[in-house]
Design a protein with these regions (language model features):
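Conserved catalytic segments around the Walker B and adjacent sensor/switch elements
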Residues: 10-12, 29-32
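P-loop NTPase motor domains
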Residues: 17-28, 35, 42-168
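P-loop NTPase nucleotide-binding module
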Residues: 1-13, 17
Length: 168
């Protein structure tokens, strides 16, 4: 109903692959996320088409801080120094993309990990070590540039193939 009465986009997070048939019938895009998938969505993709009041880099930095907080598993949240080293790394990895905004210049998680490691301080190393599972480990399918078109008005992320921990 929303798609018929508004120009809003609809994004579905589907933990049981229940919506795929409907989304396909409506001409939407189904993106299957799993370790075996050939569909990749780069968590570091940045949208430069924000209004003048919004800063895309600040919004992405906030997302990366939340992402790192989740993967580090701290019940008390990130320490102030950890937040600082993450923000510093985010600022650095987007410089090449902003200088030349082509898809191949979009940073990926290994770029973030390298920018953290290059800071040579324990807090940055701790965050980089937490990222290793997503860069070099069994969950490295997040360490790719986006290979699917997510510009469709109706997008369904099929996350059935993800483990229980990732579905959180």
């Amino acid at each position: 109903y929303v798609m018929l009465t508004t120009k809003d986009n609809v994004i579905i997070c589907d933990p049981e692959d229940e919506y795929s048939p409907l989304v396909n019938r409506l001409g939407g895009q189904v993106i299957r996320l799993s370790p075996n998938s050939r569909d990749y969505v780069n968590p570091l993709d940045i949208n430069l088409n924000y209004s003048e009041e919004e800063n895309p880099l600040a919004l992405k930095s906030d997302f990366v801080l939340s992402f790192c907080e989740l993967i580090m598993g701290s019940k008390t949240g990130l320490e102030a120094i950890e937040k600082t080293v993450i923000d510093r790394a985010v600022q650095k990895i987007y410089q090449p993309y902003f200088a030349d905004p082509r898809p191949e210049n979009m940073p990926i998680l290994s770029d973030l990990m390298a920018a953290l490691t290059a800071q040579h301080i324990p807090e940055a190393d701790r965050v980089a070590q937490a990222l290793d599972l997503y860069v070099n480990g069994s969950l490295n399918f997040f360490n790719h540039r986006t290979t699917v078109d997510i510009r469709n008005r109706l997008v369904c992320f099929d996350i059935k193939g993800l483990g229980k921990n990732l579905k959180k």
